[in-house]
């Protein structure tokens, strides 16, 4: 049984959050929203604040999940990240980067693979 896209995305974000916690990241925010857009996960990795876009798919039939992150989407994430940085007044305290996490599910959702792409894009 397939879930709707929102459920798939939410499930993938939970998998991604667990994955990065187990990798030593500290999650600061999930689903940070503002008028400019949304960032799936904001986390701290040593001296970096990391803005993470999570893409979840059933397989690679339409290409890799990260290929769905267009320049327009990257720009939206960047602008949202800028607002977050200003709101939290952290611009002089950390380095910043943009990561992507790909979650590939099987048709039963019982098995999955996770791929972390550090510094996936820069604006």
From Swiss-Prot:
<dbReference type="InterPro" id="IPR011856">
    <property type="entry name" value="tRNA_endonuc-like_dom_sf"/>
</dbReference>
<dbReference type="InterPro" id="IPR003509">
    <property type="entry name" value="UPF0102_YraN-like"/>
</dbReference>
<protein>
    <recommendedName>
        <fullName>UPF0102 protein CLK_1817</fullName>
    </recommendedName>
</protein>
<comment type="similarity">
    <text>Belongs to the UPF0102 family.</text>
</comment>
<dbReference type="GO" id="GO:0003676">
    <property type="term" value="F:nucleic acid binding"/>
</dbReference>
<dbReference type="InterPro" id="IPR011335">
    <property type="entry name" value="Restrct_endonuc-II-like"/>
</dbReference>
<dbReference type="Pfam" id="PF02021">
    <property type="entry name" value="UPF0102"/>
</dbReference>
